[in-house]
Amino acid sequence: MKGILIAASVALLISLFGTPIAIRFFRERGYGQLIRDDGPTTHHTKRGTPTMGGTVILASALLGYAVANLFTASGPTASGLLVCGLATGLGLVGFLDDFIKIRMQRNLGLRARTKLAGQVIVAVIFGVLAVQFPNHAGLRPASTHVSFVRDYPSLTLGTIGFVIWALLMVSATSNGVNLTDGLDGLATGASAMVFGAFVIITFWEARNSCLAKAAPGCYHVRDPFDLAIVAAAFAGACAGFLWWNAAPARIFMGDTGSLALGGALAGMAIMSHTEVLLAILGGLFVVITMSSIIQIASFKLTRRRIFKMAPLQHHFELKGWAEVTIVIRFWIIAGLAVALGLGVFYGEWITWQG
């Protein structure tokens, strides 16, 4: 528990006090957000707000994780390092995208194919490494079985199938967080909630690990406590950043942050063997992503749009909802999804105790 508290506290403090330094740094260099002309007119006042704040989130989380491991007996593990590596790799892809937008003074950063290629490369490397490094009990950081709240033994993907599955999960989650990052504080707050859920899940898995004591309902998860430290570090980093990212935002996370956070969430789900459960925990991201998919499909098939604008949060903006109202209501949805996911996770464990 000490490591979890240290990770969250260090990441929170670094993010809270480091973000205003980043705001001044980016503002002095003109690293401001470009606003689409075809978006909601209320967003035009945000033009020039410093972006690439995701660098602070990522750095804070990594430092929080590193400092916490100075006080743990085992030190960093393969599972924790792989999740951090995945977040860092995707953060670099997002950083390039943000930097090109700023340098070229345009809304388009990396071309779609180039950006996708970067995500694919990072995700594939992660997927390949995740099924390496067996520990003394033969457990690897990830499993080649599909998992909900634990592995389904009958749903075996094999190594190649797992890498493809990991690629799909990483791509879907990182892009889902990216689509959600359209209003001040929305993606940051929702991400903090899901990371908080993963702290609880992985801590529970550590308390009920089959490696510690074989008992009904125990979890065959490698390094669950270190994963809890990672999740706590990212939750703390998001909370500290949210202080400055809440409306009216003084800085945006940019693709640097959204891709990194999405990657970390996907990595946590894969390593904790809660892959399908992530769709419940991150229900807000799923709803927002589906709104964009439905909008595109509807327009291509019928030449009609279902929503005034996609993703969904912009639909409500154009209906006249205040930005803060949308964010708070969407946070409520995110919180309910997290509560439901935790309930499902705990309920499944209870069934083993009867």
UniProtKB/Swiss-Prot annotation:
Location of the protein in the cell: Cell membrane
Main location: membrane
GO MF terms, alphabetically ordered: metal ion binding; phospho-N-acetylmuramoyl-pentapeptide-transferase activity; UDP-N-acetylmuramoyl-L-alanyl-D-glutamyl-meso-2,6-diaminopimelyl-D-alanyl-D-alanine:undecaprenyl-phosphate transferase activity
Membrane topology listed for this record: Multi-pass membrane protein
One Pfam match: MraY_sig1
Domain of life of the native organism: Bacteria
Protein name in UniProt: Phospho-N-acetylmuramoyl-pentapeptide-transferase
